[in-house]
């Protein structure tokens, strides 16, 4: 069975209550549930992990390599603009990934315009809200089939 890992970065545990005008009203639990259901329908195993700690996300990426995960969907959140270490972990395991952002990072503050991940990602989805996760998953399902 094919396996996908969804990684959520810092503060995404607050989705649903954190700045809903920017990030929407859906909780992380709701987003994960929708993704798991969509993957199940396609016969793919999907697991989700969220952490506010960079080291834990890096360890999850390392474990994904050991577990032979086929694809990663990642919303690095604030680590998008700061984490060379998380980028290096993704490069090291060589698992293809799609970078997702709920908001359009290019229409926000200037410091959010740079991503340490976009140039090594298979694709980037930014600004489509929670639909971005689903679109990433649908693209991966098509590729894995």
Curated annotation (Swiss-Prot):
Family membership = Belongs to the type-II 3-dehydroquinase family.
Outline what the protein does: Catalyzes a trans-dehydration via an enolate intermediate.
The record describes its quaternary structure and partners as: Homododecamer.
Q: In which pathway does it act?
A: Metabolic intermediate biosynthesis; chorismate biosynthesis; chorismate from D-erythrose 4-phosphate and phosphoenolpyruvate: step 3/7
Kindly provide the name given to this protein in its UniProt entry.
3-dehydroquinate dehydratase
Q: Which HAMAP family match?
A: AroQ
The protein's matches in CDD domains, at most eight in alphabetical order, are given as: DHQase_II
InterPro entries from the xrefs? DHquinase_II, DHquinase_II_CS, DHquinase_II_sf
Active site at which residues? 23 (proton acceptor), 101 (proton donor)
Which keywords accompany this UniProt record? Answer: Amino-acid biosynthesis, Aromatic amino acid biosynthesis, Lyase
Q: Entry's Pfam families?
A: DHquinase_II (PF01220)
Question: What reaction(s) does this enzyme catalyze?
Answer: 3-dehydroquinate = 3-dehydroshikimate + H2O
Source species, domain of life: Bacteria
NCBIfam families attached here? aroQ, PRK05395.1-1, PRK05395.1-2, PRK05395.1-3, PRK05395.1-4
Q: Which PROSITE patterns does its entry note?
A: DEHYDROQUINASE_II (PS01029)
- Per UniProt, substrate binds at 75, 81, 88, 102-103, 112
Q: Name one GO molecular function term.
A: 3-dehydroquinate dehydratase activity
Q: What is its EC number?
A: 4.2.1.10
Transition state stabilizer (site feature) positions: 18
A GO biological process of this protein is: aromatic amino acid family biosynthetic process
What Gene3D superfamilies does this protein map onto?
Dehydroquinase, class II (3.40.50.9100)
């Amino acid at each position: 069975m094919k396996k996908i890992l969804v990684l959520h970065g810092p503060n995404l545990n607050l989705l649903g209550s954190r700045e809903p005008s920017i990030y929407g009203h859906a909780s992380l639990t709701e987003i994960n549930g929708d993704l798991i259901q969509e993957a199940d329908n396609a016969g793919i195993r999907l697991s989700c992990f969220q952490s506010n700690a960079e080291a834990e996300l890096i360890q999850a990426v390392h474990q994904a390599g050991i577990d032979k995960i086929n694809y990663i969907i990642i919303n690095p959140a604030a680590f998008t603009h700061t984490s060379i270490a998380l980028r290096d972990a993704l490069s090291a395991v060589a698992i293809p990934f799609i970078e997702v952002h709920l908001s359009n990072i290019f229409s926000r503050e200037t410091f959010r315009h740079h991503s340490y991940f976009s140039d090594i990602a298979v694709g980037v989805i930014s600004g489509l809200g929670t639909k971005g996760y689903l679109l990433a998953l649908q693209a991966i399902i098509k590729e894995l089939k």
